[in-house]
Amino acid sequence: MLVAVVKELKQGEGRVACTPENVRKLTDAGHKVIVEKNAGIGSGFSNDMYEKEGAKIVTHEQAWEADLVIKVKEPHESEYQYFKKNQIIWGFLHLASSKEIVEKMQEVGVTAISGETIIKNGKAELLAPMSAIAGQRSAIMGAYYSEAQHGGQGTLVTGVHENVDIPGSTYVIFGGGVAATNAANVALGLNAKVIIIELNDDRIKYLQDMYAEKDVTVVKSTPENLAEQIKKADVFISTILIPGAKPPKLVTREMVKSMKKGSVLIDIAIDQGGTIETIRPTTISDPVYEEEGVIHYGVPNQPGTVPRTSTMALAQGNIDYILEICDKGLEQAIKDNEALSTGVNIYQGQVTNQGLATSHDLDYKEILNVIE
């Protein structure tokens, strides 16, 4: 199987899906690997480093000729022309956010494996490290954009406690998963007050126990509680993600209108559509805009701003799956590995993820009923 590592085209994206170390694992197993020129530069990996591990450096067009194309994010629209029948595309594809790319993949007969939908032992194994990074960074961005020169309220999130008692900011975090706890931990490190809004009762108890000795309040998620708590936010971070599906707009425009002027609103799951009615995707170079008097931060690829760390984390997580696909062939790997099967969103043009099918009103078939 010919494996290609392509350079990301998404604005500001510095990650690469495969490290030189992982290229060596593939070539040692007898697989041919091609790497697009400068694919790893943003993460600190030179072309020479890949060549020393057995890869061949190729052009963008040549990389897309591979049987298995390994990416970080979804293909850019300019890359749709390279799709070919039975090609496998691997990455954090977030297909629920774009019906256009899904229809193109169906038309050509592509197989799409989305790392964010791979579930192992009930957890999003590959997404978790990226969620942790996005959560931590969101808390930092909330502090940054709270400053007056960035359009914020002009508040120092830490407060001041030397001979005076000026309280720090309040972070309201919607959702209680990996991204949420990482955001909360950074906010607490900044001496901020934290309110977490979570739906699941068992998770609420877990969070209450985790933060029993911290300045954290955990609130049951209801529309009424959300509307009440968002008014308190100096920084509001939504972390809600439904694997494979587009989430509902739970944070309404009216709720955003009720927020403090100059407060900061961040949606970590904007790459899947987001849960905030007023949010839209932004870029790393142009990350914020103001609407209803609130600063909106909608960067969909936050881990891409710290590519060295993020690349090491994602590459460590995905290599075993990629090796299994290359060693066994995709069909056998799917049969042998239940977690891998949950990542197959489209198989040779057929949608095989229920959430994705529902998001775009498309026909769905169970993956094991589709493969030969």
Q: For the regions a protein language model found, what residue spans apply to each?
A:
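Generic hydrophobic/aromatic pocket-lining and core-packing "Φ" positions
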Residues: 23, 47, 102, 139, ...
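Short, ordered loop/turn segments at secondary-structure junctions
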Residues: 8-10, 38-40, 74, 94-95, ...
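Adenosine-phosphate binding glycine-rich loop
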Residues: 116-160, 270, 275-372
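An N-terminal-biased, well-structured beta-alpha scaffold segment characteristic
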Residues: 2-104, 108
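Glycine/serine-rich phosphate-binding loop and adjoining beta1-alpha1 elements at the start
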Residues: 2, 8, 75-169, 299-301
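Rossmann-like adenosine-cofactor binding region
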Residues: 209-293
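Glycine-rich phosphate/diphosphate-binding loop of Rossmann-like nucleotide-binding domains
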Residues: 6-40, 149-238, 288
